[in-house]
Amino acid sequence: AYGIWDHIKNNKEGIHEHHAENYALEWVGALPGVRESRRLVGDYMLSETDILEHIIFEDAVCYGGWCVDLHAPHGLLDFNLLPSDCNFYDGVYTIPYRSYYSKNIKNLYMAGRDISTTRLGLASTRIIGCCAIGGEAVGIAAALCNKYACDPRELAPHVKELQQLILKEDGFLPGFKNEDEKDLALKAKITASSWEQGGEPEKVANGISRKLGEEQNGW
């Protein structure tokens, strides 16, 4: 990192001049970012097929949309491989609740880059945004486990409640709507003097809080 900064800051020759004389390096991470390491096995192991086929799981608690982004296993030492091989696709996919708790340790949740996926599945789910919202889902699930005095696997009958709580906290789950009976906005009649096609005012309260495909889900 310091060698690269030395080049950016001090090199002033021809096309390689970066005009960084007045810039300063304020912070460098103490540890290198680890793209992947050990993963735990849950009741379900998310695969590349699930991602590419945009599977909507009945117990979905998280979603992702990053490409299946594979990097050379040995980094710079893999001279015959491309540094990164990105397999792009359209749309988003969901991650099931069963990928977030351990298969054989009854009171253990996972969140982040250690969830139950194949290596190709992790190539998409490892992205920070996906890890963050997965962590939020696990936190809500843990609170429900406390409420019902149960282990993670035993929470399965309450997964719909978990999903609705995620949506209530401004989460998003493709294929699921806010169905909270106490949410009065869902019962309101919403009108406007004008709108664009696809942005009809009633969609403000259709229970979906994100744009999905061509549907704006907002006014």
Range-by-range predicted roles:
Residues 172-219:
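Disordered, acidic Ser/Thr/Pro-rich linker "stalks" and the adjacent N-terminal cap
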